């Protein structure tokens, strides 16, 4: 079971709700993915006016856990204000904390992230911190009270998949008891499998499903890929070797003289 701030979930897939062709396709993708948690941008809700309100009502009817985020924020002040508004709107202390440092790469500003996390943790928020694959930053986020760390595997929307598996593996090795969720950069089901094989607790993705030719089928594919990766990790994956090792025993082999 996936444990997030004292709440347990069967699914290890979290799904974003943006960019889908229609609400009906989003609904079907959520069902096929078996996800129990979806992320929502507060800016979509507030900027959308009546349409945003309808979307929130749509999500409530799905009876699913909503994780609001601070997507689009570039400063500590913006992120803290957005988090407080999200708490009022969605009636939850959970927040996926994002503070972007560069508009082109969408790389997290880790310095502002730690500062904002410290403020929000002191005000009772349960933070899901979107960060880079830097171990030291992850440790700093833990120091200020975060319990869920969400390293990227590649830039948002890039679909490149894990490009620094050594860094991700290092975070997992040094933080064995911390809940770690891969967030951003996933492009295909095999990427999600790799993330889970590294020992990560869950995967959050959006574009790879929303922009697929068949989002509903892709959602199901990701669900199964994540299950496979988790099972492989739990089973104990054979480490790669630099030399060949025979798999066929030689006991009983005939000897000719």
Swiss-Prot record:
Q: Does the keyword Cytoplasm apply?
A: yes
UniProt catalytic activity: [ThiS sulfur-carrier protein]-C-terminal-Gly-aminoethanethioate + 2-iminoacetate + 1-deoxy-D-xylulose 5-phosphate = [ThiS sulfur-carrier protein]-C-terminal Gly-Gly + 2-[(2R,5Z)-2-carboxy-4-methylthiazol-5(2H)-ylidene]ethyl phosphate + 2 H2O + H(+)
Q: Which GO terms describe its molecular function?
A: thiazole synthase activity
Catalytic center residues: 96
**Is this entry keyworded Cytoplasm?**
yes
Record: residues binding 1-deoxy-D-xylulose 5-phosphate: 157, 184-185, 206-207
First-tier enzyme category under EC: transferase
Write down the HAMAP family for this protein, in alphabetical order: ThiG
Q: Per its UniProt record, what InterPro entries does this chain match? A: Aldolase_TIM (IPR013785), Thiazole_synthase_ThiG (IPR033983), ThiG (IPR008867)
Q: Where is this gene product found?
A: Cytoplasm
- Similarity comment: Belongs to the ThiG family.
Q: Which residues form the signal peptide?
A: none
Identify the EC number(s).
2.8.1.10
- Pathway field: Cofactor biosynthesis; thiamine diphosphate biosynthesis
**Assigned keywords, A-Z:** Cytoplasm, Schiff base, Thiamine biosynthesis, Transferase
This chain belongs to the protein called Thiazole synthase
Annotated Gene Ontology cellular component terms: cytoplasm
Biological function: Catalyzes the rearrangement of 1-deoxy-D-xylulose 5-phosphate (DXP) to produce the thiazole phosphate moiety of thiamine. Sulfur is provided by the thiocarboxylate moiety of the carrier protein ThiS. In vitro, sulfur can be provided by H(2)S.
> What species was this sequence derived from?
Bartonella henselae (strain ATCC 49882 / DSM 28221 / CCUG 30454 / Houston 1)
């Amino acid at each position: 079971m996936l444990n997030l701030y004292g709440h347990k979930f069967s699914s290890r897939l979290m799904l974003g709700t943006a960019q889908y062709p229609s609400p009906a396709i989003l609904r079907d993708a959520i069902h096929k993915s078996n996800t129990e948690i979806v992320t929502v941008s507060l800016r979509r809700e507030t900027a959308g006016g009546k349409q945003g309100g309808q979307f929130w009502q749509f999500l409530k009817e799905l009876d699913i856990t909503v994780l609001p985020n601070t997507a689009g924020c570039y400063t500590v002040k913006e992120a803290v204000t957005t988090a407080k508004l999200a708490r009022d709107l969605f009636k939850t202390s959970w927040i996926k904390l994002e503070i972007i440092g560069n508009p082109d790469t969408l790389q997290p500003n880790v310095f502002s992230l730690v500062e904002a996390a410290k403020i929000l943790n002191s005000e009772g928020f349960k933070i899901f911190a979107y960060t880079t694959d830097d171990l030291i930053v992850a440790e700093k986020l833990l120091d200020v009270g975060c319990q869920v760390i969400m390293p990227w595997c590649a830039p948002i929307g890039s679909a490149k998949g894990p490009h620094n598996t050594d860094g991700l593996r290092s975070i997992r090795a040094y933080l064995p008891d911390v809940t770690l969720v891969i967030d951003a950069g996933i492009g295909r089901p095999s990427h999600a499998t790799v993330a889970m094989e590294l020992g990560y607790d869950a995967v959050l993705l959006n574009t790879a499903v929303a922009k697929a030719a068949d989002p509903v089928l892709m959602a199901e594919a990701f669900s199964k890929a994540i299950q496979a990766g988790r099972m492989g990790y739990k089973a104990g994956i054979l480490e790669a070797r630099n030399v060949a090792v025979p798999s066929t025993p030689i006991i009983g082999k005939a000897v000719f003289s």
